[in-house]
Regions:
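A charge-rich, low-complexity, intrinsically flexible signal that marks solvent-exposed coils, linkers
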Residues: 1-29
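Low-complexity, intrinsically disordered short peptide segments enriched in small/polar/basic residues
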Residues: 15, 51-52, 66-69
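A short, structured beta-strand/loop element
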Residues: 32-56, 60
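C-terminal structural segments of small proteins and small subunits
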Residues: 57-78
């Protein structure tokens, strides 16, 4: 669980510098399953019914939008 804790702490400190792979890893640790890949959006579903859609950065952007990172952090609090 050390990697999960480090990812959460990094997201809290600097939400503007989080890559999509890190968001995907944290959602996987929390039990979210990728169920829809359409274009630049990835949708995740949790067994308890929670849904989450994350926009994959493209072009020159390397990191996820801070709003998406905050949305993931809010889902972790529940």
């Amino acid at each position: 669980m050390a990697r999960r804790e480090k990812l959460l702490e990094k997201m809290r400190r600097t939400p503007a510098k989080i890559r999509f792979a890190e968001v995907h890893a944290l959602l996987s640790y929390e039990g979210f399953v990728l169920f829809n890949k359409r274009g630049s959006h990835r949708s995740y579903h949790h067994a308890d019914g929670r849904l989450m859609t994350i926009v994959v950065p493209h072009g020159r952007h390397k990191t996820c939008h801070p709003t998406d990172v905050r949305k993931v952090l809010e889902a972790m609090r529940r």
